[in-house]
Amino acid sequence: MVNFFGIRHLSPAGAYHLYHFLEEKKPKIVLIEGPSDLNEQMQYFMHPETKPPIAILSYTKQSPIKTILYPYAEYSPEYQAIRWCKENKTICRFIDLPSKVFLAFSEKREKQEQKEEQWNVYEQLDKQSGEDGHETFWERTLEHTQDALAYQQGTEVFGKNLRELEQQREEDYAETLVREAFMCRKIADVIKEGFKEEEIVVVTGAYHVEGLKCWKEVSMTDTQ
């Protein structure tokens, strides 16, 4: 069975628990939610002269210029996963849609937001949690837990709740399904390369764990 570890980006607890999870599992390959066309940039993360925080900037060349910034701190789970792979001479890859696709998504989203106020799934979660906000909810229930298993299980539940809410927003959820189908395809490709399921760890936002666990059924085809 493929090992999945759901995170929250820029979560110190996630970075800590993930590093120790990798120490326990000793995978032969680690797949990370991140633009797959930026894999060449990963080599610079652990360069002796590179000191976090760092970021990768993707941009268009035609006016109006569109940009997307991918930030990483030392306490980013993704950064710690890359660090572990470097230390243990383990293959590490980003598996999400290429950044140029996200740039196209952002342009489409901007046009949509001009027509209507953006629906915020986190506001809906805040109402359900009874907290001052989802940040407070996360801090209280997950960020301070010292139990790695409790963190992992808690993030999955948190992600499932987000998915249930976003399904009410069909256009946003459709984008999610495309991303997950692409990432599922990347997982399937790794299996075809000869890796066993138990040798793989997939690091992704907690929101996507449930969608990616169905990788055998929903992976993207060549035509798609």
Residue locations for each model-derived region?
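Compositional signal for N-terminal targeting/processing segments
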Residues: 1-224
